[in-house]
Amino acid sequence: MSQTSLHHARLDWNEAGTPVSSEFGDVYFSNDNGLSETRYVFLQQNRLPARFSHHDSDIFVIGETGFGTGLNFLATMAAFLEQAPQSGNGARLHFISFEKYPLTREDLRKALAAWPELATFSQPLIEQWPLPVAGCHRLLFAGGRIRLDLWFGDIKEMLPQVPHPADGLVDAWYLDGFSPAKNPEMWTQALFDGLARLARPHATIATFTCAGFVRRGLIAAGFAMQKVKGHGSKREMLAGERAEKQPQQTIAPWYARPAGRAGEVLIIGGGIASAMTALSLVERGRRVTLLCQDGEPATGASGNRQGALYPLLNGEHDVLSRFYSLAFGFARSRLLALAKRHPVAFSLCGVTQLGYDDKSAAKLAKMAQGPFPPELMQVLSEPEAEQVVGLPCGHGGVSYPQGGWLCPADLTRAAIKEAQASGLLEVVFNTEVVAMAEQADGWQVESRDGRRWQAPNLVVAAGHQLPALIPFAELPLYPVRGQVSHVPTSVSLSKLNTVLCYDGYLTPAHHDHHCIGASYGRNQTDLEFRADEQAQNQARLQACLPQQAWPAEVDVSGNQARVGVRSASRDHLPVVGPVASLAKLADHYAGLQGDQQNAAPLPLHPGLYVLGALGSRGLCSAPLCGELLASEICGDPLPLAADLLEALHPARYWVRKLLKGKPLQ
C-alpha cells in the first residue's frame, strides 16, 4: 500500500451550529440531539451497555466506518467506563474507526463544544488529535483502558489492510458515515464484505439507514439483518448479527503473529525499547518482570543527554516513511502524557534538516514531493532556514515543526515509573542474563550469578546484545558505536532554536551545553572515549557549513562525551515480533516460491519475541514498537497495516529469500 496524500475536511456550519461537510453536503450529526441518536442507533441497537457488563473477554472491540467528529466514540467511551467495571478488573475497550477527511483540531474542538457533558472525554481526544497522515493512529484514554485506532484514508484502501485473527476481530460494528445518497462511493458491496470479514462470529451491526441495497448487501456479506424503529422522526433503521463464518485472515501465514500465552512476561533489557514494552503490557493488566543488566535503567544507547525526535522520511514514500511518520505521532503522544506525571527534559522546538550538498539537497527535494502535510514537514529556503534555526546556515532544507529533542534516559525512567505505579512491573537490576531455555510451557532464563526466572512469554529487547542472547535466531543485525560530544554553549550557539541536522546533528542548549554527534562505527562495540571522533563531530559541522563563522565556536577540547552502542538492520527498520524456528524454516517452506496458497503458518519458538534494531531513531520508533509487541502478545488489535507488519517481522529476511527460491545460507 503506497502512502497517499490526505486533506482536511472542509466544513460549513448551519443555523443550528451543526458542522456540515462541504464535500458531501451532509451533516456530521443530527440537528435534533445527535448524542441521543448515537446512543439509540449504535449503543442500544448493538446492546452495548449489557454486553460491556457481561462480556466474556477482557477486551471489547468496536469498529466504525466514519469517525467524523468522534461523537460516537465519545458516547461509547462514557458508556463503557460507566458499565464495564461490573465485569471485573482488566475490562478494556478497543475502538477502530476510519476517516477519509479528518477534521482540523480547531474544527474538532468547535464541533465537540456542542456536548459539554462529554468534555471530560473530548479534551484528551483533542489533545491527541493526529496529523493528517494516512494509516493507523493509535490514541490512548483512561490510563490505557481504552484505545482508539484512527485509520486515516479511504476506507476502501484501509479496510483490507487491517490485520485480524482468522476468526475475526470486531464485536460490534457502527455502520456510519454520510448518507448513501450523498456518499455512494463508500456504501458498496466491497465495504459490506470487509465488515463481515473483520467481524467475529455473532458480532452485531447497526446503521441509521434503512436503504434496501444496504440491507441486501449486508445479508449477502453474511449478516442476518432486520428493520427496527428508527430514532426520533426516522421511521426505520437496520440492525443485525454476523452468522458463523469461515476463517479468513489478512496476514500471510509466513508472517504470522499469533497471540502469546496467557500470564506473565519476562523482558530482558533496560533501555527505552524494554521500558515502552513493559508500559504497554501493564496497561493491559499483564504482570511483567524486567531484567536489567545494569544498576539503573538507560545506561546503554538510551542514556544520552539529548536525542532528536523526528520521523525518518525518504523520497520513495514507502514502508519506511509510512512507519516512521506514524511512529512519530505515537511517540509524541507518549512523551507528552508521561511528561505530565514524571520529570522528562524535552523541548518540541522543531528539527531542521539541511540540504548541505548537492546529494542531500536532491534527496530532500524528492522527499518534499511526497504526501506529507505541512504539519509534519515543511520546505525551507535558505533565508527561511536561517529564521527558523536562529543562525545562518547557507543552505535551505526541511523543517519538522512538531519534532524536537528529549532526554532518552528521562523518558525511559518515566515509562518504568509509570508501569511500576500499576503494581504489575518488577524491575531486577544488576542482572546479566547468560542463558535461556525453551520449556513446554514457557521460557527459563538464568543470570550470571545463577538466579533463574520462568514465564510463559519472553521478550528480548537488549539492544546490540540481542543477537548474542538468541544466536539460534540468526538475525542479521549489526552494532553501531556512536560517540556524542557535549560542548559548552556560546554567544552564537545559544541562539540555536531547533535541533539542526546535517551530516550529524546539533541540539539547542540544555543546562548550558549542547550535544553534537554522532560518530558512526559499524560493527564496533567498545565504549572507550576517542579523541579523533571528538574532533570529527566538530569537523563535520564545519564541513557542512563552510561559509559560516559560528561553527568555530563549537569547542570539543573539554573531551566531554558519551559513547553508546546501538543495534541496526540493513533496511533501517526495527525487528518486532515472534522468533521463527530457523532450523524448521527451510523444510517448512521448501516449495514456497511455487505454492503459496497452501502454506502453513510460520514455525515459531512459542512465547519468544524480540524488539531491536532501532538504530538512531529509537526515540521515534520505540513507543510504537513496544505497543505493537504488547498488542501481539495479548491478542489485541495491531496498530499497523498488514504490509507494515510484514516489513517489521523478524523473519522477513529469510522469508524473502524463500519467496524468491533462494537458499537461506
Curated annotation (Swiss-Prot):
It comes from the Bacteria. The keyword Methyltransferase applies. GO terms for biological process: methylation; tRNA wobble uridine modification. InterPro entries: FAD-dep_OxRdtase (IPR006076), FAD/NAD-bd_sf (IPR036188), MnmC-like_methylTransf (IPR008471), SAM-dependent_MTases_sf (IPR029063), tRNA_MAMT_biosynth_bifunc_MnmC (IPR023032), tRNA_MNMC2 (IPR047785), tRNA_S-uridine_synth_MnmC_C (IPR017610). Keywords: Cytoplasm, FAD, Flavoprotein, Methyltransferase, Multifunctional enzyme, Oxidoreductase, S-adenosyl-L-methionine, Transferase, tRNA processing. Coiled coil: none annotated. Catalyzes the last two steps in the biosynthesis of 5-methylaminomethyl-2-thiouridine (mnm(5)s(2)U) at the wobble position (U34) in tRNA. Catalyzes the FAD-dependent demodification of cmnm(5)s(2)U34 to nm(5)s(2)U34, followed by the transfer of a methyl group from S-adenosyl-L-methionine to nm(5)s(2)U34, to form mnm(5)s(2)U34. In the N-terminal section; belongs to the methyltransferase superfamily. tRNA (mnm(5)s(2)U34)-methyltransferase family. This is tRNA 5-methylaminomethyl-2-thiouridine biosynthesis bifunctional protein MnmC. One of its GO terms (cellular component) is cytoplasm. Its EC number is 2.1.1.61, 1.5.-.-. Pfam families: DAO, Methyltransf_30. Residues 1-243 are annotated as: tRNA (mnm(5)s(2)U34)-methyltransferase. The gene is mnmC. Its cofactor is FAD. The keyword Lipid metabolism does not apply.
